Amino acid sequence: MQYPAYDPDGNVVRNAIYSEELIKRRYNSWHTYEEDLLNLGWCAHEKMAEVMNALPDIEQRTDKADLACGTGLLAKAWRRQDMVGYDLSYRMVELSRASGRYARVSELNINRTPLPKKYDLITACGLFGVEMATAICLPNIAASLKDDGILLTTMPQHQGYYDEAGWQFQTSFELIDETEEFQSWLGETSGTPKYHKILTWRKVNEQ
């Protein structure tokens, strides 16, 4: 199954279309995922944990879910076992469960269905990116949040991802804060350095 991004007129706006099969194949066979990311200096999970801690009402947001949780790097940086993890890859779910970093971990495709309950806060660290998810899944994420729920996302600042993935057309969330750009792969020595921001979104409640 492929999930392109569309503009309001129904035109595909992204060249690299998200492929469920490709993502599953990649991550189901990636046994050294966490080791490889840390060796390349991936640090976005630490930045997102800092943003979580800085939310003024974080203690009141008791129901928290982590989308595309991988092996649980965000939960490790968060240092509390009060989050629920979801991932498309059964291998990542297995590794994350074994880590004990989440209260619970389940396999789920957010492009197909909302989460099974509503949360106060949803995090998506690494879910959105080139050849990854597009803005088309945002209605399902919004449906998984309580009224005035918060979504934290990493947002690539390279390769035109924001425009190609249809974010300028989404109506499910309003942007309320963003960090400065930061180099997300500190150990990368080849090619152009890649930068991300952490964006804070509030769910737009239906009138």
Q: Model-derived features: where do they sit?
A:
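A short acidic, Gly/Pro-enriched loop at the edge of an enzyme's catalytic core
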Residues: 113-122
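Conserved class I S-adenosyl-L-methionine
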Residues: 1-56
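Conserved Class I S-adenosyl-L-methionine
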Residues: 163-183
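Class I SAM-dependent methyltransferase SAM/SAH-binding core
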Residues: 65-113
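Conserved beta-strand signature within the Rossmann-like core of class I S-adenosyl-L-methionine
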Residues: 148-157
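Core SAM-dependent methyltransferase catalytic element
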Residues: 188-207
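A short SAM/SAH-binding and catalytic strip from SAM-dependent methyltransferases
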Residues: 121-134
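Class I S-adenosylmethionine-dependent transferase superfamily signal
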Residues: 141-142
